[in-house]
A protein has these predicted regions:
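Conserved phosphate-binding/catalytic loops in two-lobed NTP-binding clefts
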Residues: 28-31
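Conserved helicase C-terminal RecA-like lobe
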Residues: 5-21, 33, 40-209
């Protein structure tokens, strides 16, 4: 049905919108691919720093915050009854961890500041650069596929604006009166729908990709 992985996104979107079951053989759905999940995780943090997506990207790309460190942060947050983000912003127990955690918090805060007033497609571009994801995947053997998929997220963002009748330069982080939410949240809701696990079930009559 398609020539490359990135092209599958439009087909998946159409099938999901029309409640047509499908299966992808030998691959993952677009929004389930690692690099795409990384991008959407950062987007979710822009929308809500308290989101659990923090666990996915706090060390992606690698920045010295491994599993053991994350367990410490998680335990500390639970013991204090605060969120992971709150715990990161005021961690004082370990100077080395304070530096690493502070650097991550700064990345997210700077990213959000840079995205104020930008359209969704531009927001994705900022995320790719400021998160370090683009540079990280450029160093991978399969960089062409990875970068193409991340670039397709930009196309998906632009397409989502058109499909929902949103002005091309409408700010992604501001609440849209017609939508009742920000364009960013609307896009993330659509991404979650397209990544729904129900399409992985065994269905006799389905589109095979």
């Amino acid at each position: 049905l398609y020539r490359n992985n990135a092209q599958s996104r439009l087909i998946e979107q159409y099938l999901t919108a029309n409640a047509v079951p499908y299966r992808i053989y030998g691959g993952l759905r677009f929004f389930d691919r690692a690099e795409v999940k990384d991008v959407t995780a950062y987007l979710r943090l822009l929308s809500n720093p308290e989101d659990t997506s923090l666990l996915r990207v706090i060390n992606q790309p690698p920045r010295g915050i491994g599993l053991t460190t994350m367990e410490r942060i998680t335990q500390e947050a639970q013991s204090r009854g605060v969120t992971l983000w709150q715990c990161l912003t005021d961690w004082q127990q370990d100077p080395a961890l304070v530096r690493r955690a502070g650097a991550f918090v700064s990345i997210i805060n700077d990213m959000k500041a840079a995205c104020e007033g930008l359209s969704l497609a531009k927001v994705v571009e900022v995320v790719l650069e400021k998160s370090g994801l683009k540079a990280f995947y450029e160093g991978k053997p399969d960089k062409d596929i990875r970068l193409e998929n991340m670039g397709e997220v930009i196309n998906a963002a632009s397409g989502w604006y058109k499909e929902n009748g949103i002005e091309e330069d409408a700010p992604a982080l501001d609440v849209n009166e017609d939508l009742g939410m920000s364009p960013l949240d609307g896009f993330l809701s659509q991404a979650a729908l397209e990544a729904d696990d129900k399409n992985e079930e065994e269905v006799r009559d389905c589109v095979q990709m």
